[in-house]
Amino acid sequence: MTQQPQDDFDRSVEDAQAWMKAVQDQLQVNDNTQGPRAALEARLWETEKICQLEPEGRVRVDLVLRMAEALLACCPGDQKPGILARLKDIKAQWEETVTYMTHCHSRIEWVWLHWSEYLLARDEFYRWFQKMMVTLEPHIELQLGLKEKQWQLSHAQVLLHNVDNQAVLLDRLLEEAASLFNRIGDPSVDEDAQKRMKAEYDAVKAKAQKRVDLLEQVAREHEEYQAGVDEFQLWLKAVVEKVNGCLGRNCKLPITQRLSTLQDIAKDFPRGEESLETLEEQSAGVIRNTSPLGAEKITGELEEMRKVLEKLRALWEEEEERLRGLLRSRGAWEQQIKQLEAELSEFRMVLQRLAQEGLQPAAKAGTEDELVAHWRRYSATRAALASEEPRVDRLQAQLKELIVFPHNLKPLSDSVIATIQEYQSLKVKSARLRNAAAVELWQHFQRPLQDLQLWKALAQRLLEVTASLPDLPSLHTFLPQIEAALMESSRLKELLTMLQLKKDLLIGIFGQERATALLEQVAGSMRDRDLLHNSLLQRKSKLQSLLAQHKDFGAAFEPLQRKLLDLQVRVQAEKGLQRDLPGKQAQLSRLQGLQEEGLDLGAQMEAARPLVQENPNHQHKMDQLSSDFQALQRSLEDLVDRCRQSVQEHCTFSHQLLELRQWIVVTTQKLEAHRGEAGPGDAESQEAEFERLVAEFPEKEAQLSLVEAQGWLVMEKSSPEGAAVVQEELRELAESWRALRLLEESLLSLIRNWHLQRMEVDSGKKMVFTNNIPKSGFLINPMDPIPRHRRRANLLQEEEGSHEDFSQLLRNFGQWLQVENSKLVRIIAMRTSTAEDLRTRKSKLQELEARVPEGQHLFENLLRLGPARGTSDELEDLRYQWMLYKSKLKDSGHLLTQSSPGEPTGFQKTRRWRGLGSLFRRACCVALPLQLLLLLFLLLLFLLPIREEDRSCTLANNFARSFTLMLRYNGPPPT
């Protein structure tokens, strides 16, 4: 009876299982998201159809359930568990199938939707890309003016901002593409597609950025040009107002003030011309980036400004000529009065400036540098006042000349007298302040000596007291006192050593005699200190040896070893180069302190030797410690010597640099004052004062070369930062010197113009000018009837007066030539292993060649003074050395072009191919023309006395002296 329900149940179960297996097989076939979009859509439709079969499967499962209910109702109890188990499996299989259908379809549908959204976003991005490319493709349109260019720039910046904003969308698209590629693996979203999208975006961004940069440059150029135009128009407006204020008959200003105003305006014209030329140069670039109408407007604006400037210049020239005519029509008396008043006013300003800058009461100086600064300031003021002495004499002479005229000059004479009295009082005050500063410096420098005297008394007393100390407590009492006295001795030694290094400063302040006496006193005190210091060290060693008797070797050796290691570390730390003079002085002080500590350590080591007690191990340790200590002492002595030499060189350099700077400043102020008060009326007095100032130039020029050489030595012994500072100081000094020489040349040209004006006025004499005008005299008058004996007397006076100048110039030139020659020798000795070395050597040779005109100028000054005194052997020696140096420098330049990297350069290089025959032929070719030339010169020298009887034989004998010099010369010939 149960067989039919059982068969129906089995049939329904098999049918349901077969259907579910078929569905799962179809799902497994379509369960894949890889591949192109069409395949994905096909799988999506298949899974959707499979999902639509779910009711059919549910019907089959329900049928199984009904069959199971019927079977369970009629089957025996022992079969029910099996039926229920099969029923449970069918339900579980059905749930799994339904879940698989849903998940498979949902996954494929989600990927398809994701892909669709990505395609929409990508299409939107490419629409934006095409739109942006169309916008950025056309060339930049030329605009009319600055405002339009700024608008165009703003629009380009907006486009660039839009491009920057699209970066977020692009990053999102790239992320989605990478995610899709991981799921579908389609080539449309692979890495190449992503890179293409990124490259296209970068191209658009670069194009937008390039457009913005170009428009920014165009706008910036136009802004700079417009700012220059506005500034020039303001200047032009101000000049027009000034010129209008000086024009017309109704102008209330005095003629001199109007003429001065016009001269000031004339000084501004070159600046205006330069500004206009600069604007015209800038306009070329602006016009290229401007529309034709805007370019026409710019060109018209420039032409209008040019016309206004030319019209203004013509108006100024016409008015200045008219005012000069009026000014020349005034009387000579009024001209002299005004000149005297102007010079008096200038003199008052100079006195006021000197009183304010150099004679104001300064704060109480606390340090040595402040005291030296005060003394230098007072000395510079005193020198400046002394240099104004010729001006005082000139004021008195001009006042005497004006007194003969029948006019009331009492106010003017009172002003002159009051100014001269003020000048005298300032001289007295400056001398008093300078002497007071020198006294303070003397007391400051004497203070270490006084402290040393007190220390000597204390040290002698300690030596007397510690002569015999029987008990141990006394040793512990006096040993720290001796150590303190030794520390004070080291401090005093540092102070006295620094004082000895300031020899140039002491000589400059106190003079040679007092400075020498002070340095001798310091040296004697140093010797006394050294004796007492050594005595204290011996006494300390003795006391320590007494204390050491109560210790063992290990307790005494370990502190000595630690102290030696500490000294070695500190000495190693002091081997670096310092930046400036205070750093070098501090380093020297530290090294001297280390020396004192080394002496103390040596005394302690000697005190510890009795503890060895013939122990070989202890003896070996002690010997090793002594060896290390001696090596440290030698290294420390070398360091101290080098540091002391470096400090001394730096002190000398700083002192001479400061002196030369002060001289340049004072001389520049004097020359500026002469240029400001210069006029053709007092040309002779101005010329005399100018020659007096210029006479110091050769000596200072030689001093400049020495300072530069000392500066290079200081740079070699300084740190890179310090060398840069010294190099900057030398550069500033050279610029100041060049500015001073330019000022000298301008004044020289001005005085020449005065002589030309006087020559035009004086038609009774015929002046002869040459291009080679010496600085000591500007006019050569062949018709001057000076008797021969008077001329000889003048020459003798000039010879006596210039003897000291000649000797000083001779020494300066010799020192300068020695420094330059040593530099050349070092350059020749260089080994050019690389092309960089060759370029370095070439640059150094070019620097030496650039200073040859400077040496030639110094040598010409020597020759100018030499013939008046007769040619000396020293001058002939210097002449030969100078000729030899120039020849060696020239040959070094030629050999530089023939040498290759890695070979010895200069005169070290030999030429093996040069044979004896070639050398002989070259010597003959050179010697024969020289012999003919020498014979011709001898003939001319013999004929000179026949042509001019009153000619001195000095010049004729110069050539014979050169033969004498060559006979005495034993060195190699010049190359």
UniProtKB/Swiss-Prot annotation:
GO terms for cellular component: cytoplasm; meiotic nuclear membrane microtubule tethering complex; membrane; nuclear envelope; nuclear membrane; nuclear outer membrane; rough endoplasmic reticulum. Pfam families: KASH, Spectrin. Keywords: Coiled coil, Disulfide bond, Endoplasmic reticulum, Membrane, Nucleus, Repeat, Transmembrane, Transmembrane helix. SMART domains: KASH, SPEC. Residues 1-925 are cytoplasmic. Residues 947-975 are perinuclear space. Residues 617-645 form a coiled coil. The chain crosses the membrane at residues 926-946. Spectrin repeats lie at residues 220-325, 647-740. The disulfid bond with SUN1 or SUN2 is required for stability of the respective LINC complex under tensile forces. Residues 917-975 form the KASH domain. Expressed in aortic endothelial cells (at protein level). Core component of LINC complexes which are composed of inner nuclear membrane SUN domain-containing proteins coupled to outer nuclear membrane KASH domain-containing nesprins. SUN and KASH domain-containing proteins seem to bind each other promiscuously; however, differentially expression of LINC complex constituents can give rise to specific assemblies. Interacts with SUN1 and SUN2; probably forming respective LINC complexes. Interacts with PLEC (via actin-binding domain). Interacts with DST. Interacts with SYNE1 via spectrin repeats. This is Nesprin-3. It comes from Homo sapiens.
